[in-house]
């Protein structure tokens, strides 16, 4: 360290406190990174990696960015999961002896972003804090850009569902704990010292934040794990934000039992937030329903989808509001137009509180407040009864509008310092400074013209840079005409730069005026923000009301476009849907192309539907549309059906598709069984179970046995008796209806004509005893030889009396053993699930069977 420069020592002292972050070190007009940080920045930001001498014989890697381009580069690093410590100059050059003082003013992490261009407009940016025990967990979350702060304590089995619902950008954990994230989630994991999660430390942090003596008023006094998570979260935010976190005024405490529960598999299988194919908004339920016009409405819709209601009165309030907008098309259209002019008032309110809002954003806020007044005139003066509940917070804020109108210019720049933010006439002293700076600039322009005429040098020009200040530049060709009073300041390749006493005098005048102007404008702007901060709660209340109106009117718009109907709720444990449709599949097919289907499920007489039929015929679509209709109804939306009479559903479970969990070392079948076990252990009589192909991951007889046992268990357990849709390729299960009274058989109608099969996609009563797997294989494009041979093998398998000691030889001389002595191959063929094989897998299987037959000399 002896040969290290003072600047490097200062940097190292700061860097040692932020070893896991990239330090952006302010040096004049640049943020510089050093050493390994510089290598990372150069690679990830695609900027030049250079070096700087920072001691005798010591060259340090260096990469920098202009200070005004910070947000752009910051977003690229944050999106890749990095943390960035912003180290600013906190004193001015010359104010203190030696180096300019520097300190980290903020640690930016994926879960603590507040810059608008770094955030998804219609999605919260949650920071999640977890404290885990063997069977329980405390969970706390916050979005400092919207002031949301909440916590809960729940069973460890429900944790993954909450993580999937919140989709946090960052998760904090004690250093001695670990977490396996859902496969679709890309969250940064940050570890904290376990000290911050200790019960007494965390409780004290919450009490200090809310300035209270106990937490009873917040409803979490008896949630010790939730308190640990919430207290640690506040400590982390305080460390990263270097502020008091005043925007987190309320703590929302909830339990998972307050809402319909859906695990992460259900959210994924039903494609609630993202499509399974492209992992995008398009093709998801959110993509269908999101006709919202505001950022606040988009975020609220996500919350609705993640937390369907269980209280019928709350559902009916939403449905009544949707009724109004459904019936009043002019009001709906007018509101949509107005909402389209509303900025993100929720995040703006918090940026005012944090004093980070830009002058130009205040004009956007002013325009939004004017639109709020117009919406209030339309709905608030005489509130329609069906909207009254959601209009409570909608109130014009004329005083706030007046402050902005009187203080901020009509078209301010994004930054302060040029005297163009504060309106003329607001502060006399500032007006004088602006005039002085303006006069000086005019003088310089006039001086340039005058000196050109006086010297006869037409190419003479005045310029400015931060190193030399103002200067007169003269090309080499005209140096012979330079007056003697010009003082040489800098030599360039093709020109010389000069100053004069007169120019230096005005330089001091201008720079002093600019410095004083920046100080004064910054101070006045802060005063304005302090005044506007007094309307924080009222602004948030307006944002909340507008978000609700936005979502509910969007539900009505979707209902009108797609011919949805209002669902009806009743106390009986049954659901009865007439001509139900799958909202996403219907959109993909186009209007009128989807085949609608009925469904009736009841705990009294039709608790379980066994659904049989070929793949590709629509079994999964039918199962999913039922669950989606139930979910849509309980968020207060109309539903895709002709009629829908429903009961409240406490949980939706889905067991669909095959997947491995490689991180846990679990096979496809083990994953299937674990998920099925979870469903059977936690479902209630008010749950809806969607089970597709239980038992497919093992041998035929094992799978059939498990599938049958699952159906019998759901039917016979008094504490379960959940409404169940059970799709299967095991045709033997249709026999269950003969001795289980609440089991009914349904199948997918198929039309056959001269060997051609047409799937009608219509659900009809009764079971089927025939598979159409080979037909599906034909549709998939398997070679004609394979299809022909498959039909031959199927015929032999279905007619054992006609078997010969050896099967006849086909054109390719492929022989399949069918005698008693070759029972192993025979059993393997019987267990083939042809309808589940891809074309390539089917062909590979045929070659495998051929090889085994040849090895046996058959």
Swiss-Prot record:
Gene3D superfamilies membership: 1.10.1420.10, DNA repair protein MutS, domain I (3.40.1170.10), MutS, connector domain (3.30.420.110), P-loop containing nucleotide triphosphate hydrolases (3.40.50.300)
Plastid recorded as keyword: no
Secretion signal span: none
UniProt-listed SUPFAM superfamilies: DNA repair protein MutS, domain I, DNA repair protein MutS, domain II, DNA repair protein MutS, domain III, P-loop containing nucleoside triphosphate hydrolases
Single Gene Ontology MF annotation: damaged DNA binding
GO cellular component term, pick one: cytosol
GO biological process: mismatch repair
SMART domains named among the record's database cross-references: MUTSac, MUTSd
Family under the similarity heading: Belongs to the DNA mismatch repair MutS family.
Function: This protein is involved in the repair of mismatches in DNA. It is possible that it carries out the mismatch recognition step. This protein has a weak ATPase activity.
Protein name: DNA mismatch repair protein MutS
Source organism: Dehalococcoides mccartyi (strain CBDB1)
